[in-house]
Structure formats: C-alpha cells, structure tokens
C-alpha cells in the first residue's frame, strides 16, 4: 500500500530547487515523495530498471527489463544499435557520483568495456559502440 497526498505532491511540484524539495520532505518526516515511491514500486512490480546515456547536450534515462544484456538495451535506443552492437563502455552510477565526471572515472580506471554478454545493471551509464 502506497499512500500519496495529492496536496503534498502539488506543493513539492511548486518548489524550484532540489534542496527546497528535500527540506520540505524532511519537515514532513519523509525521505522521498509519494510519486517517487509509486514509480519505484511500479518498476519493481514490472521488473524494470533504468540505464543512462549522456552526451554533451543531453542526458537521458532509458527503461529496460531487468536481466537484459547490453545489445538488447542498445536496441531500446535504436534497432540499429542492437543489430550492429560491438561493445559498451560502462560507468557505474556510484563511480560517477564519487569521481564527478566521465573523464575522472576514466582516469581512475573505473570505466568498463563490456561485450554482448554483459547484463546491464540499474543505473549504469552506457555508451554503445556499434557499426551498421
């Protein structure tokens, strides 16, 4: 059972910064919004996870089924990515947070290069190499 207050969610939506939202939630004794709890519960029930792609102009989250391998996840972006999959460069979300940038992760030797059998993990930051 997930209890959600429409008024509380509306109040959160009106706040501009992440910090303001966190302070508001803390004042209510909450760790996260009802919407976030609902989304997490739905993802869990449907066996879904998220990987991330990031470029200079855009960062995007992509939904996939838990247990999918790298080529299948590449296909979520475009079928040509799956057909011509070569490899995936992978940064673990926690490593990105710790080091602060792709360059710093690479310099620390924490960027992985994975093949067709790699099972994508929730939160992985992916860069797919392909040839069609």
Residue ranges and their predicted role:
Residues 1-121, 126, 131:
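C-terminal-of-GTPase-core extension/linker across diverse P-loop GTPases
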């Amino acid at each position: 059972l997930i209890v959600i207050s429409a008024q509380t969610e509306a109040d959160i939506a009106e706040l501009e910064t992440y910090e303001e939202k966190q302070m508001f939630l803390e004042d209510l004794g909450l760790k996260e919004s009802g919407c976030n709890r609902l989304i997490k519960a739905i993802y869990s029930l449907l066996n879904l996870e998220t990987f991330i792609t990031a470029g200079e102009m855009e960062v995007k989250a992509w939904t996939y089924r838990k247990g999918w391998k790298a080529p299948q996840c590449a296909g979520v972006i475009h079928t040509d990515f799956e057909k011509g999959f070569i490899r995936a460069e992978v940064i673990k979300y926690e490593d990105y947070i710790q080091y602060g940038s792709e360059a710093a992760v690479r310099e620390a030797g924490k960027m992985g290069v994975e093949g067709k059998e790699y099972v994508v993990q929730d939160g992985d930051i992916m860069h797919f190499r392909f040839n069609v």
